[in-house]
Design a protein with these regions (language model features):
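An N-terminal assembly and electron-transfer interface module characteristic of large anaerobic redox
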Residues: 1-166
Length: 166
């Protein structure tokens, strides 16, 4: 499964935690923006019910510097949360699925449906498309690197052939 870090408002984080667990993802980091009395208990119940093979770290009320460090340690493949995580996403080269509040760097974010059946299906589509895009980018980079190596090798082979005494 895909390793995901989820952060934001506690209610949204619990919802995205459930959605990701139910769809075979590994939530390696769960970070609600503030401490609430029952968050850890509710999150742990959901995690325990899935019998995961990975360690899930729950950090409540982290500032973004501490969150940044926690994300680096957890090594997720995807981030799920608000726009405030875009710099971490860019630094680490990890895709960000924007969900929750605030989303201030996208037009129409206030109309993104996340509640109910239609919202869950929409989120699953967004998650899946993000995973597919990340895999596409990874494969394209490998292909370009191989092409570059092939071109350098053939160029060097030709150059060395011309430099040989006849």
């Amino acid at each position: 499964g895909t390793r995901v870090a989820i952060y934001g408002d506690p209610e949204m984080v619990l919802g995205m935690l459930s959605l990701s667990l139910e769809n075979g993802m590994y939530p390696v980091l769960v970070a609600p923006s503030c401490k609430t009395p029952a968050f850890r208990e509710h999150a742990q119940e959901r995690i325990d019910a899935m019998n995961l093979d990975c360690d899930v770290k729950i950090f409540e009320g982290l500032d973004f510097d501490a969150f940044n460090d926690a994300v680096k340690d957890a090594e997720p493949e995807i981030l799920m949360g608000n726009s405030n995580g875009k710099y971490i996403s860019q630094q680490m080269g990890v895709p960000l699925i924007r969900v929750g509040f605030p989303i201030h760097d996208r037009v129409g974010a206030q109309r993104i449906l996340t509640m109910g059946y239609r919202g869950a299906m929409s989120m699953i589509d967004r998650i899946t498309n993000t995973i597919l895009e990340a895999k596409d980018i990874e494969l394209e980079k490998k292909w370009l690197q191989n092409k570059s190596n092939d071109l350098q090798g053939s160029c060097c082979d030709r150059r060395s052939a011309h430099m040989q005494p006849h």
